[in-house]
Regions:
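An alpha-helix initiation/capping motif
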Residues: 1, 85-93, 184
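Conserved phosphoryl-transfer catalytic core
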Residues: 56-83
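Phosphate/oxyanion-binding loops and surfaces in catalytic or ligand/nucleic-acid-binding neighborhoods
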Residues: 14, 72, 102
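Conserved acidic, metal-coordinating active-site core of Asp-based
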Residues: 88-152
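Charged catalytic cores and adjacent phosphate/nucleic-acid-binding surfaces used
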Residues: 2-42, 51-54, 106, 129, ...
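Flexible, glycine/proline-enriched loop segments at strand-loop-helix junctions
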Residues: 48-57, 82-86, 121-122
Length: 234
């Protein structure tokens, strides 16, 4: 959450609304689940504790993956640190950027597909909070949790609708329907789930920098959904 203050100041300077948010990697019975937490409280002790535990595990995992990948590709921990900049933690995108800079892959997406994905021999799992616990923690702190790219099955296993029902019961507020990894059929199915469970229908570019194909401004959240998310703040 270190960049939220700077982002808020920049948004104010250019006259646009700013919605603070973080993405939290979680699990459900071995399946990776990503939560978007809008309007998080950076000082709330429960959020701080959850993120600190996850951050430490991510760094340990990144170091082990660098050791594995470095045996076959031009990659060192120092390379990764150069690409992580002032980030609070080190994750797979930083490994991907270092591999691209070394000429091992053309794009970040290529690096993920070949060596960084969950089905890769180089992949190392790491601790992530159980998603239902994470939702309760976020809601208890006043944040607004949204399930990110719930149908992105090209990335690995996805949870079934019954789990989304459990998440909604735990306090989930929104379901990210509009996403580049969702087909039109998936978007329709997810929109129906969101309506049935009274979840806010959202969208997002999932833009994490220039290393991926995602473009700012694609798959946006509607003004009505934005207002519904604002109304859900604790």
């Amino acid at each position: 959450m270190a960049g939220l203050e700077e982002a808020a100041e920049t948004a104010a300077a250019i006259g646009i609304n700013f919605v603070p948010g973080i993405e939290v990697s979680c699990t459900y019975e071995g399946i990776s689940v990503h939560l978007l937490a809008y309007w998080p409280d950076p000082s709330h002790p429960d959020i701080v504790a959850m993120l600190n535990k996850t951050r430490a595990a991510r760094i340990d995992r990144a170091m082990e993956m660098v050791a594995r990948i470095g045996a076959d590709y031009p990659l060192t921990w120092d390379d990764v640190l150069r690409h992580s900049g002032n980030a609070e933690t080190v994750g797979r995108p930083h490994l991907a950027d270092a591999l691209v800079a070394a000429g091992a892959f053309a794009t970040r997406d290529d690096a993920f597909a070949e060596v960084l994905a969950g089905n890769s021999d180089y992949f190392v799992p790491h601790y992530a909070p159980p998603v239902l616990d994470a939702i309760r923690t976020l809601r208890g702190s006043g944040a607004v949790p949204v399930f990110a790219h719930p149908g992105a099955d090209a990335r690995g296993r996805v949870v079934p609708p019954t789990v989304i029902e459990e998440m909604a019961a735990a306090g989930l507020v929104g379901l990210e329907v509009e996403h580049r990894d969702h087909s039109e059929v998936q978007r329709g199915r997810l929109a129906r789930i969101a309506e049935r469970l009274d979840l806010v229908h959202t969208g997002a570019s999932d833009y994490h920098g220039t290393g991926k194909l995602n473009q700012l401004g694609e798959n946006v959240t509607s003004p009505a959904s934005y207002q519904a998310l604002r109304a859900a703040r604790g």
